[in-house]
Amino acid sequence: MENVLGLVALACGIIIGLGAIGACIGIALMGGKYLEASARQPELMNELQTKMFLLAGLIDAAFLIGVGIAMLFAFANPFVLK
């Protein structure tokens, strides 16, 4: 029982940590490509900015889904029988 709770805590930390790293890298790459594209074609900056913010929201949403799953495992763990 104690072993399962310890492994669940470790798994929650890994889910949140790797999700945060992935979201940060994804948003950084997307922001860099947005700057490159807006430097090449400044007339498309407003359209590209709208698409960039939509994609940033989707990337953050995927991370927050991972956080929600980690919180489910942390507080309402389906693997521990009470």
UniProtKB/Swiss-Prot annotation:
InterPro entries: ATP_synth_csu_bac/chlpt, ATP_synth_F0_csu, ATP_synth_F0_csu_DDCD_BS, ATP_synth_F0_csu_sf, ATPase_proteolipid_c-like_dom, F/V-ATP_Csub_sf. CDD domains: ATP-synt_Fo_c_ATPE. It is a multi-pass membrane protein. Its main location: membrane. PROSITE patterns: ATPASE_C. The chain crosses the membrane at residues 7-27, 53-73. One of its GO terms (molecular function) is lipid binding. The record marks D60 as: Reversibly protonated during proton transport. The keyword Lipid metabolism does not apply. It is found in: Cell inner membrane. Keywords: ATP synthesis, Cell inner membrane, Cell membrane, CF(0), Hydrogen ion transport, Ion transport, Lipid-binding, Membrane, Transmembrane, Transmembrane helix, Transport. GO terms for cellular component: plasma membrane; proton-transporting ATP synthase complex; proton-transporting two-sector ATPase complex, proton-transporting domain. The keyword Manganese does not apply. F-type ATPases have 2 components, F(1) - the catalytic core - and F(0) - the membrane proton channel. F(1) has five subunits: alpha(3), beta(3), gamma(1), delta(1), epsilon(1). F(0) has three main subunits: a(1), b(2) and c(10-14). The alpha and beta chains form an alternating ring which encloses part of the gamma chain. F(1) is attached to F(0) by a central stalk formed by the gamma and epsilon chains, while a peripheral stalk is formed by the delta and b chains. Belongs to the ATPase C chain family. F(1)F(0) ATP synthase produces ATP from ADP in the presence of a proton or sodium gradient. F-type ATPases consist of two structural domains, F(1) containing the extramembraneous catalytic core and F(0) containing the membrane proton channel, linked together by a central stalk and a peripheral stalk. During catalysis, ATP synthesis in the catalytic domain of F(1) is coupled via a rotary mechanism of the central stalk subunits to proton translocation. Key component of the F(0) channel; it plays a direct role in translocation across the membrane. A homomeric c-ring of between 10-14 subunits forms the central stalk rotor element with the F(1) delta and epsilon subunits. This is ATP synthase subunit c.
